[in-house]
Amino acid sequence: MKLVFRWFGEKHDTVTLEQIRQIPGVEGVVGALFDIPVGEVWPLEEIMKLKETVERAGLKLEVIESVNVHEDIKLGLPTRDRYIENYKETIRNLAKAGVKVVCYNFMPVFDWMRTDLHKKLPDGSETMEYDHSLIEGVTPDELIERVKEGSEGFVLPGWEWDRLEKLRETFELYKNVDEEKLFENLVYFLERVIPVCEECDVKLAIHPDDPPWSIFGLPRIITNKENIERLLKAVDSPYNGITLCMGSLGANPENNIPEMIRYFGKMGRIHFAHVRNLKFTGEKSFYETAHPSFCGSHDLFEVMKAFHDIGYEGYIRPDHGRLIWGEKARPGYGLYDRALGATYILGLWEAISKMKERYC
């Protein structure tokens, strides 16, 4: 296991590289270039600047999250080939900088979705919540305004405002795209990009839909074991893999996360993992909790044991954390709770390793 920590860059993050460097066991950061418009080539010069900044702090930059996929590719529009060529060139540039894994998603219009970015918990901490009944009661425009207000000026990953400017127009285009068509468009994209990944030794890791069900009638296609397996078989290359995000897949209690880790891990197709916990509050409703098992609805010991059992040597990062101890930061991405999550993950890994050494 290689423990990494998401970082949004000097311009966009309240957390510094110096602080990340002091978290025990963290080897590197998961970075991105947030000022490059979606669909444009990431210049090698800018990638190298990011790499040099990270390495000066004593950390590595081997995982990128995310190189966003242009909406024209998801929609299957005639312009998609131009954007696919740009994506391929970005992968080549990332490879030159030593990047090993690129996380991406194929969610239409919206990235991850929450209805409250500042839910107050009894202990005074703040967390993010998803209440499906609120989704059913608002328009997409109203929800965007709510997210803007709750972001407190931070640009949230996947919610870059330039992507949402043509919301109504984009929704209209998706009226002709069902789950099957979206899947076809994803396969079309991968059939052209994966050969470049193979040439450059860069692995693609698709992030599951968050949450793993349809919202506002938009199709969702990476939601469970069955449709993930279908995608991996459709483009059957070890470079076509997944980001095992237990918070996204785990929002559906029918998804058995340890089982999925063992299944896809034995196939060698888990290239990256996000580990976090959440608490179910009703059907299709939950809020995010601290990482320890007793705080949420998932057993983190069993999750980490599954990774250990398959001999996982890939990248893992603590995912969304609460805002605690008065911290003002991007919702889900403060320093303190994610640092606690990182040490909890590391502690579980050490305990599992030593249990096996002594008793197996």
From Swiss-Prot:
This protein's pathway: Carbohydrate metabolism; pentose and glucuronate interconversion
Reaction it catalyzes: D-mannonate = 2-dehydro-3-deoxy-D-gluconate + H2O
Pfam families associated with the record: UxuA
E.C. number: 4.2.1.8
InterPro entries attached to this UniProt entry: Man_deHydtase, Xyl_isomerase-like_sf
Broadest EC class assigned to this enzyme: lyase
Reported cofactor(s): Fe(2+); Mn(2+)
Coiled coil location: none
GO molecular function: ferrous iron binding; manganese ion binding; mannonate dehydratase activity
UniProt keywords, alphabetically: Iron, Lyase, Manganese
Function: Catalyzes the dehydration of D-mannonate.
Family: Belongs to the mannonate dehydratase family.
Name of the protein this chain belongs to: Mannonate dehydratase
Annotated organism of origin: Thermotoga neapolitana (strain ATCC 49049 / DSM 4359 / NBRC 107923 / NS-E)
